[in-house]
Amino acid sequence: FNIGLDWGMWHNRLMFTAEYYYSKTTDMLYEYDVPVPTFAFDKLMANIGSMSNQGIEIGLSVVPILNKDMEMNVNLNLSWQKNKLLSLSGEYNGMKMSASDITPIGSLYGAGQNGGNNNVVYQIVGQPLGVFYLPHCKGLAINENGNNYYDIEDLDGDGNINLSDRGDRYIAGQATPKLTLGSNISFRYKLFDVSVQINGAFGHKIFNGTGLAYTNMSIFPDYNVLEDAPEKNIIDQNVSDYWLENGDYINVEHLTIGCNIPLKSKSVKSLRISASVNNLATISGYKGLTPMINSYVVNNTLGIDDKRNYPLYRTFSMGVSVQF
C-alpha cells in the first residue's frame, strides 16, 4: 500500500509532496538443493521466498524569485528506503524447502585479493539484502618476520580465529544507501542563466578493495602500490572491516552556464551559447577512487570497490544553438 500528500500554495510557487509505501513480495524465485531421487536433478527453482520494502519519498519545489529580469527555481527530492529479506523457506508440492540463511553474494578475486575467505557482501535472512558480514580487525599486528597483518578479533570467544562464512564475522553495515538525494537549481538574470544538478547517497558503507589489494606488499612489492604501502608493510590478503568505509557523498553532477545573445537579424531568430561540466565535484570522506558505486550512477558492484572500477571522468563541453 502507499499513502501520499500533495500540497501547494502561492500559485504553486511552493509545492510539497510526500509518499509512504510498503510492499511485501512473496513467492520469490530461488534455487534450492533437493534430493536425487525424489527429483531428477539436485537443483530446483521454486517460488518460495519473501521480502519486504518500505520507504518515504519527499519532494520540494520552490520558486523564490520570479520577475521579468530574474528567476530562480529550486527542486529537491529525498528518498528513504528499507528492505528486508524475510524468508527463504516454505513448502513446494507438500515438501519442506529451505535455503541457507547466510549466503555470500559479493566477493573479491584477482591479484592482491586471493587470500581465501574473501566473501564480503551477504544475503542474510532478517536483514536488508546486501549487508557486509565481516571479521572485525582490532588493528595491525607484527608477525615473526616483522611484517604487519590484520589482527582479527575472536568474536565467538572459542579461542580460534575462523574466517569462514559462519565463523568470526558480524554484520558491519549495508551496501545500499538508506537515503538518496537529488536536487536541481536554476537561476536566470536577464540574458544569462545557470543550472546545477546535485545528487547524494547516505547511510551505507563501501568496502575499499582497491586499498586492500594495493597495500599488500607481497603481491605488488615494487610497483602499483599505494603511497603509504611501504610504510604500512602489510603482508595479508584477508578481508575485514579494516577496509570498510563510510560511503556517504554529495556529487555536483552537472553545471551549465548559458547566455542568450540578442540579435537584430531577420534571418536568425535566436542565438544561445553555453558551457557545461559533468561530474564537477564530489564531497566524501571515502578514500578510494570514487564513492559512487552501487548507486544509480554506477550500479554494478554492490558496495565493493574491487580495484577494477574506473572513476567517473569529468567532461567539459560547449554548445551553440541557433534558431532560424
Predicted feature residues:
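Repeated loop/turn-to-beta-strand initiation elements of outer-membrane beta-barrel proteins
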Residues: 12-16, 56, 67-68, 191-194, ...
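Residues on the lipid-exposed face of transmembrane beta-strands in outer-membrane beta-barrel proteins
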Residues: 3-7, 18, 58-62, 183-189, ...
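Outer membrane beta-barrel strand-and-loop segments of large Gram-negative receptors
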Residues: 17, 21-66, 139, 168-173
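Transmembrane beta-strands of outer-membrane beta-barrel pores
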Residues: 20-26, 62-64, 78-84, 189-191, ...
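C-terminal beta-signal and terminal closure region of outer-membrane beta-barrel proteins
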Residues: 48-53, 100-138, 222, 235-239, ...
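Extracytoplasmic gating/loop element in the C-terminal half of outer-membrane beta-barrel translocons
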Residues: 142-144, 199-280, 285, 292-294, ...
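Conserved small-residue
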Residues: 63-173, 278, 285-288
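Outer-membrane beta-barrel and related beta-rich outer-membrane complex signature
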Residues: 28-32, 70, 80-104, 204-228, ...
